[in-house]
Amino acid sequence: MATTMTKWTLKGKGYEFCNCNPGCTCNFSGFPSSSDGSCKAFVGVAIKEGKCGDVDLSGITCAGVFDWPKAIHEGGGKVVFIVPEKIRDDQLDALAKIFTGQLKGLPWEILGTTYVVAGLVKADMKVTDAGMESSLKVPGVVNAVGETFKNPVTGEPHQAAIALNDGFIWKRGECGVGSFKVDAADLHLSYKNTNWILYDFDWSN
């Protein structure tokens, strides 16, 4: 008899910072626009509604620190996950299975094949949810700050967004300029004035 796979669903808001130029060419050509062709990213995941089997994941804010030497689909990456300090064991187990693609479902059944888990940090993350001026901070671990594009002539806010009808991570992303510094386990990243995208996600298997 075939084993029934545990059903899961996550809905919420994503905060994506990476070392590509603003807009991130990976969304179009599949390859980074970073100076060395690598993909380094910090992605915050604020789960508003979430469930994996009987495990409630609603209200959890977590993150991944990603380090791929080339384009994501070329693999060879590493990730360190950041989870709340007091996360329950059953919640951590559920998220680990989701984010490593063990339970299938996009985007993680694809992303999970491109990296190995290099560490886990248990620390509470402070999210200042202010649209394109949002920030995410864990003292001594991560500081990520987003900014709205500015019109080069007037200096006024310049709103920009990307629509991906077939996007498997997000369908619509609000774009801006971000800076992020991360020291998590063995991953150390620091970038200024690079890509930052804010989006809503609805993932499931």
Residue ranges and their predicted role:
Residues 3-50:
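N-terminal ordered "arm"
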Residues 1-5, 202-205:
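Intrinsically disordered, low-complexity regulatory segments
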Residues 35-107:
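Aromatic- and glycine-enriched beta-alpha-beta binding-site module
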Residues 62-68, 128-131, 184:
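A general structural signal for short secondary-structure boundary/capping elements
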Residues 53-59, 81, 115-121, 170-177:
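Low-complexity, flexible helical/coil segments
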Residues 2-4, 29-32, 66-70, 122-123:
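Intrinsically disordered, low-complexity boundary segments flanking structured domains
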Residues 152-205:
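Extended, charged low-complexity segments
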Residues 77, 81-158:
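Charged linear interaction tracts used for macromolecular binding and regulation
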